[in-house]
């Protein structure tokens, strides 16, 4: 956890809080023990381990809550040159096969495509050229193995939401000469806010009563699934981990050889912040240690400073390089104390509203838990993340080309930040996005684009500079075919083309 400043409390208050923690923890432990004892899951041992890990997380949450901790903002400072390594200073890799033979690749595949209006795993969304995130990721590894005559395993960390569908889709790759495997992250019980009791009363039970605990669970899941032992037995002692929706996260030989030669246990790729990244987690120096800081950990009065690209200039890409024996060590010795991110929401159970809480962790917060860590400043093309329809729209345009599964930016845009694209709710779902913009405009010279309202595009549209397009309320605004828009504002209603 972050270094904390403690609120001073009277002894009577502290005693009361200690009793409250003890009662809540004891009650939760009893309920979890009942779940395990009466469970009908196929792997009772693994389920028991997961409930033990959840209880440890819950108990830490209770302790941190009742002690009244707040973030000590004064101990946090932005990264300086001495806190990171610039990618341009890394030596070139001279023996690719030697290093690749020690590597495995994990893609984080726990998310569904709900934010893009689909009810299947996000990895299966078509990105471009009739290829999904999963297709592109596998193409990368297939090319890497073929080019260097190696066998880098490709592994997916699924959640219970994505596991079944993903395993079905993977059958189509049966003929590929790639070692493809999966493991599943933990399943933790949601907790009622009022009673502080777990929502599920049995296991298994409806999936709505459970939640995936975030990608910080990868460390426990790697060990308890047996994945680490299997990889180490194959001579694979380094892992490259990234989000499956980051289309720039391919294996980089210079980074790989650097972390191996320097025996780095944990390396995080960071990149320059842009105006599109104001809420993305950042790497900071706190009391001489590298730490990940997320938006919800920042005191309200410092949010503006946190989001500024003038103060905190580098963001976490979630591209992480791990030394597997070190992962095994910190898990088995129970050395991991990842920052807890509680999330409260209102859901319906038995047609009645109920407030529930989930406790998640992030892989990035583990950087402070390993012995030899670093941040590597990489160029923006290694962070092409697709979180919403605006991002998907951008990666489908002519700014990018697909090269053996990796997205490569046009040479003319190298060194420049990608365009900032903002779209209103009319474009939120994939189906609506493709209906309204069936033909991708040219955006090689675009700086920013803002679209709002009932807007449609024709064919062969060219966008340059800063563009704002706003349809008047209750009207349709159609951008005609062959239109060239440059540094302009388009408003009103106009329907002079075939939509």
UniProtKB/Swiss-Prot annotation:
Transmembrane segments: none annotated. GO terms for cellular component: cytoplasm; cytosol; nucleus. Coiled coil: none annotated. SUPFAM superfamilies: Nucleotide-diphospho-sugar transferases. One of its GO terms (molecular function) is uridylyltransferase activity. Pfam families: UDPGP. UTP binds at residues 108-111, 122, 185, 214, 245, 387. This is Probable UTP--glucose-1-phosphate uridylyltransferase.
